[in-house]
Amino acid sequence: MIQNGGTVSQGSVLCYACQIPAKVAVSSIRSFWGHSLENKPRGMTFTDMSATSSLLLSGGQNFLSRTIPVLPTLHKSSTTPRATKDSSGFRFPPMTKKPRWWWRTLSCIPYLLPFHQAWMYARTAYHLHPFIPYFQPMTYPFLMAIGTLPRWSLIAYFLIAYLTIVRRKEWPHFFRFHVAVGMLIEIALQVTGIVSRWMPRSFYWGKLGMHFWTTAFFVFLFTTIECIRCALVGMYADVPFVCDAAYIQIPHE
C-alpha cells in the first residue's frame, strides 16, 4: 500500500484498523454497503446489515452462539446386535398338484446312467463279488449299449440336456430339476473314476481301497435309488450339496 510516496506494511495497516473506534468503523461499513446495495433490487436490508456488522465488531459472541446450529448429541443404543435368519438357501417351488405320470417317468431316465455305472465300482469291492453275478445281467446290456457309442457321446449328452432342458423354461421345473440332479451324480461318478487312476496301486487294490470302493458303491447306488423313488412319487430329491448345485443351474421362473 503506497500513501504519500511511502510504503506501509500489512502489519501496520492491521494495527491501525484495530485502533479505529467502533462507531467510525460502523459508519464506514454503512457507507460502503449503502453504496453497493443501491444497484441491487433484492437482498438484505440496510438495517439488517448494519445490525449484523455492529454485533460482529462489538464481539457479540452470544449472537454467534445463537445463530450457529448445534448438532444433537448421539446416544449409544443399549440394544445388542443379533444375527438374522439366513435366507440365502434355496426353497423348492410349492407343489400345488402332483406332476403327470409321464413327467414322473421321464424324470427317471437321467438316473439310468449313474445307476448302471455304479455297478462298475462293485467289481473293485471284494465284499460284493458274490452278489455281482445276480445283478450283472440287469446292468450289462445297458453298459454294452453305452460302450458302442463314440467317446464324445457323453459330452454331447450333457451339453444337449443342459442347454435344451435344464436352461429352458418351457419344460416343467420338476423335470428340469431331476435332469440336473442326474447329470451331477453322473459327473461325480466320472470324477471319482478319474481321480482313482491317479492313486497308487496299493490304494486301489489294497485293503483301504476295498473299503473305499464298497462305501462309494453303496453311496452312489442308494442315492440314485432314492432320487428315482422321489421322481416316481412326484417329489424333489433332497440330496445334500447336489440339490443346491442343481437348483442354481435352473433359471428362476
Swiss-Prot record:
Disulfide bonds: none
Induction field: Down-regulated by heat.
Organelle transit peptide residues: 1-82
Cellular localization per UniProt: Plastid, Chloroplast inner membrane
Segments crossing the lipid bilayer: 101-120, 142-162, 174-194, 208-228
GO biological process: protein transport
Topology class, membrane: Multi-pass membrane protein
Keywords for this protein: Chloroplast, Membrane, Plastid, Plastid inner membrane, Protein transport, Transit peptide, Transmembrane, Transmembrane helix, Transport
UniProt keyword Signal, yes or no: no
Top-level taxonomic group: Eukaryota
Cellular component GO terms, alphabetical: chloroplast inner membrane
Its job: Involved in protein precursor import into chloroplasts. May be part of an intermediate translocation complex acting as a protein-conducting channel at the inner envelope. Seems to be specific for photosynthesis-related pre-proteins.
Family assignment from sequence similarity: Belongs to the Tic20 family.
PANTHER family given in the database record: HIT-TYPE ZINC FINGER FAMILY PROTEIN-RELATED, PROTEIN TIC 20-II, CHLOROPLASTIC
Subunit structure: Part of the Tic complex. Interacts with TIC22 and with the Toc complex.
Name of the protein: Protein TIC 20, chloroplastic
Source organism: Pisum sativum
Lineage per the UniProt record: Eukaryota, Viridiplantae, Streptophyta, Embryophyta, Tracheophyta
